[in-house]
Amino acid sequence: MILPFEYYFLNDADNSSKSNYNNIQFINENQNNNLRQKPKFYPNNQFLIEQEQDKYENKKIKNYISDQIQLQPKNTPINKMNHFANINNYQDNKFSLESLNQAQQDNLQKEEDLSILSFDSQEELNYLQEGEENNQFLNEGDIFGYQTRYTFFENRNNLLVEDATNKNNNNYNYNYNNNNSSTQRNYDFNYQNTNEMLQKKKKSNFQNKSQSQLNNHKNEEKKPSQQRKEQLMKRFESLSRIYNKELSQTVTNGWLKPSQAKTISQDNNLGSSAAKSSKVFYQQQKPFSAQITNSSLKYAAASNGFQNLDFSYKQKQQLIQQETKNKIKEQQNVESNNRISMKPPKSANLNSYKNISNLKNFKEIILTRPNSKQVKFQQQNSVNSQPSSLVSQPLKIQSIEKNNLNSNLNDQNFYDDFAELGSTETTGFSFQNVFQLAGVPKDFIASPRSPVQELNQKQENRENELDQMLNDHHIYVASSVTNQNQIKNEQTERKPNMFGKTLTTLARPFSKEYSNRKDILKSAQQNVRFNKNLDYLDSQNKVVAKNKKRTIFKINQNNLQGNQKDLQSNQTSSVISQQNSIQQYGDDNYQQNQVLNDDQSPLIKQNSIDLNAAEIIQNDENENTQKENVLQQKKNQSNQIVTSQQQSNNYFKQETTTNTSNFSTTSNRIISLQALRQKNNSTVKNSDNNNQNQTNPQNQNTNLKENNDKQNLKKTKIQSASANQAGQSNNQLQKTFFINSQDEYVRRTLLRMGWKENKLLLNNNFDLKWIYIDSNDDYKFLNDNQFYNHFKNNTELTQKGRLLYNLKNNTQFGVNQELFFPRCYDLGNDQERGEFSNEFNRMNVMNLLKKHIQYIKLRRSQTYQEIKQAYQQKQANKLNAQVKDGIFFAKVTKQKFFSPLMYEDTKRDNRFIFNITVIAEAVEILKKLKRQQEEYIDETRQSRDCQLYIYQTNFKLESMISQYVKINVPFDEEKFVFEKIVGMSKEHWSSPSMKLMKKLYSLYKYFKDADPQFKVSGTKNIWIIKPSANSRGSGIYLVDKLDEAIDSGLKMQARIVQKYIERPLIFQGAKYKKLNNKKFDIRQWVLVTSFKPLKIYFFTSSYLRVCSQSFDLDNIKILSKHLTNFSLNKNSLAKENWDETVVELKDFISYLKEFKNIDYQEDVKPKIKDLVIETIKCAADKIVNRKKSFELYGFDILLDEYAHPWLLEVNLSPACSERSSFLTEMLDAMAYKMFQIVFKQNNLQEDLEINKETAISTAPASCQNPDYDWEEIYNEEQKEYFCEEDNNMQLAFNNDIQLMVIGQKADLKKEKNLDKKYFQYWGAIKIQSKIRSFLAKKKLQRLKNQKFTFAAIKIQQKMRQFLAKKQLNILKKQQQTNINIPIEDFNQVSVIEV
């Protein structure tokens, strides 16, 4: 049972140009369950297959294949499925399903064409199927499609072929994968059974044939002869050697005309079968072959068989060798005197020889190659001479293995191989010779679509491209003598040139113009290299030139102040030194301009900036000295110096003009050798003239004395005035800044203020540095006069974990962070993780209380009013507290034990039902929390650290409360839902009493007043988890379960959890446009210019960030409903609607006044200012102050439904994308006025702005808006106290201490009274404690002494009773015996005894 096509099929061949391997698709096993369904008569415990099973399976396979073929379009190219269909339907082909066995996977290459061929007779087919001796031929024949079975796999869309023919085994193993189970059923059977099955299936495949035809067919089944075997082997070797990828280029879109197929078949002795088969395909509009691959062309696949192929491989090989030998002899006869070695030139591309497989697989091809020695010999004789006729020697190339058929026409190395093979001068190089040697027919080579024509055309295009490159890039030509030496010394080296490639290979070194082009390229490389070296040396020369100039100017000043004799003697040296300095300055400027025009390295630009700055400072220092020297010296001396400078300047101008003119002319064209020589001669003459002028200073002196004194004085005044103007302009342009962030508004503002940007990253030449995030290394390399937009240790405010730590520590200074910062915990700390779990459970109890009170308030308003009035009256009549002498004495009540019956009374409201068990437990927990909170000194502080020990003893009630709170159904239906979840019986549900409801209201009222976050915390118990250091909303998510929050803290330590404000301010109504039913927060800019003393500025305007989706607490997984970060919300909006995520402050103020009747300027803004001040003060001591540093912070503030501000986080370098027009205006105004404040405090305002008019002209138009301004909200001025007398003995440790007086002056009388009262109360407490202990001990001693007396009294009482009874019994006996005793005597005796 064989199922080769049941699991896989091919897609419709839409892309016919692609390979067949890309059209493979895996079939889902569930799509063909009917094919894999096991028949009913399958045996369970047997491994033999009966005839009925084979027929059943084969019918299914044939029907499935035919259905797949019908689904394909008619004009699609022949793919694998078409071949498989032809196997079953084509009568001449004797394949059967059983013959499609697996072929070896190791012998298959990915890019080989797997085509199916027909055979001459059935005997050839049987010859391939039978016997062990033919297995080798089968393995070798896999390249041409002698595979016996195909299976398709999805691994990289490649088709793998496995060999099913085992060399020493005749057994066959088959695997059948059942769809319903993963077990594999292996069916093994003998070879005899397979022969019987083959015969049965052959009958089914040829049902249309008569019985006579089948008998004739069986008689024809004979093994082929030995001669036929040899022909098949030779056919395989010849086709694998000759027909390759180049031949496949002739086929246009897979088509081949019959005439071309006929000529090809005749030239190669392949018979007429190729022409016949191609004619049939061409008429039926079918492709020439299944697919022409990149590795080789399968001509046998195109011709659909090896029919009538009669030729001898040895004869063909001999003909090829004779042709090559004849060509070699002809070349040797013509040029026998010029034999050279086989060694290729060094300039050739040697890497291409490694890939010699590009020359294809022919066994021995004799090629020619020029020798590098003769090239050297000709270059030594004359550079302009071309290489003469070169004699080539044969070069034998070993045959390559058959499997190495991977070659690409698009590969550049392929063309380099042919270009480097070379040729003689007479014949020239051509690809025709190579293809002829390979055995390609001449008619095919001459055709216009042959690869030979394409290769020749590409070679010509490469030559044209080289000529164009030489003309476009302006390569200079050096002298012939230097070129000869360079070629001699550097011929063996391969160096990259200015084009990024090796132009020696592009120049085709064995062409006619090889020598000239090689000289041009070598000279171009050296000229470019020489120019680069000069440019890189400029930076070092400029530093040396600075020092020379300073020394020269000092020498000139000393000479001018000296005597006349000294001036006359040193006149010549001073003039020469000045001329040299001016020449040097001119050369530096000329080189600098050349560097800037060519866009050289940034290092040279940096040095030029430093040079200009040094020159400006030097001119400013020497202005006054030059004026004084000119007035003091004599007229002749001043005339001489001025005229010498003028002459040197004129000379410098002439020299620079000649240099620039030569440079401009040479940049437009390639100058010749004569032009270079003329230029060199002209420069030599100019240098000679220059030396003559320098060596004859007397002639200059005579000309200098002839000038007038007045004209010289006017010229000096004009020069000094122009220098002053240039100095002022240079001073304004000296201010530079460096920016490395996305804040474009900062760049615009500084450029508007006259600053220049320094774009060099590794450069410290700037006056202001603006970056996104700072590092500790930045502060090490900063100078004292450089501005920086950060303070060291600013993470104390901007990191969420550090901000939490600083705010908690700030409570000891009287700041209650619970009023403006939601509860927050660090999940990386074990202690705070435990506090968070307690807080989470506490919030569940609080939410339970809120839920019941809210239900009573909404559904039973009358009952709620009664409870409220009773609570107010109870608080008014409370007389258990008294105040004496300012001391509060409270009545202490005993703790009552928990009992649900204590809240039962006769008054009940039967209209609603509560879970009395859960409510009573919650009330007891709230009472304990209340007592623990009242024990704190600060009553307003929230009791967060209290341990809820009741949860540890009764964990079941804890889970019940948490589950009861999370029920999100109407209150009347909670009973039924809660019973299903918890499983509590109906006995726990009953209507609440008035006493219970009053107790709930009193607890609700207490926690509402004591807890500032009680109103905004909501009833869902949602918490938000944030990474400590991330920004822009990354890594943030919301949770409502304790386990999720704690697990996130254990996995990632740098995380905090913060209480989510469930009741924010939400506007409802279409008139509010962007804010309708959406959450928002406020981004407030704050500027800090100093931390010691602390100076805080508050920007008067701000903007609102709005969520892109409506607010919904039931869906906490969609972050765009809860977070306002633009980086998260922009993905859910189109780019045109990005402005919906931002709202201007003035619109919000009007909405707030209309919706809540709240004034933002009076009610909200002052609270935000206090929030900012307290937040910055908590970390001010830990941030390092710097004089010229400043910091811009972004405070994110959220308003609850009562318009109370809450701090969410503080952002470092707040990012603001300019997605609205008002944002750009506000940013420009904010940045401009921010820099005005920063520069004004550091006395830089005068340098930046000369007058008010220029300041107004440079300011943006938005600065005129009064709403856009900075307001100083906190200024902690530093107060310094000094002694009236000089104190020279100042201590060292007092230098850095900053003391400040806080509070009022001390009153001594009040202090004394307070001390007396304190000692009195303290003494009374001590005395009382001693007396109480004394009295207690005395009482115990008294009890110990009295216990003996009590015991004696008890014993006496018992004894008396016993004696009295005994005496009465005696008297009774005497009366019975008639003994008369007087009563008086009896009484006396009894009394005495007693």
Curated annotation (Swiss-Prot):
Mutant phenotype after disruption: Cells lacking TTLL3A, TTLL3B, TTLL3C, TTLL3D, TTLL3E and TTLL3F display shortened axonemes that are resistant to paclitaxel, indicating that tubulin glycylation changes the lattice properties of axonemal microtubules. Axonemes are however normal at the ultrastructural level.
PROSITE patterns: IQ, TTL
Ranges of Basic and acidic residues composition bias in the record: 217-230
Matching InterPro entries: TTL/TTLL_fam (IPR004344), TTLL_monoglycylase (IPR051437)
Chief localization: other
Superkingdom of origin: Eukaryota
The protein's Enzyme Commission number: 6.3.2.-
Protein name per the record: Tubulin glycylase 3E
Source organism of this protein record: Tetrahymena thermophila (strain SB210)
Gene of this entry: TTLL3E
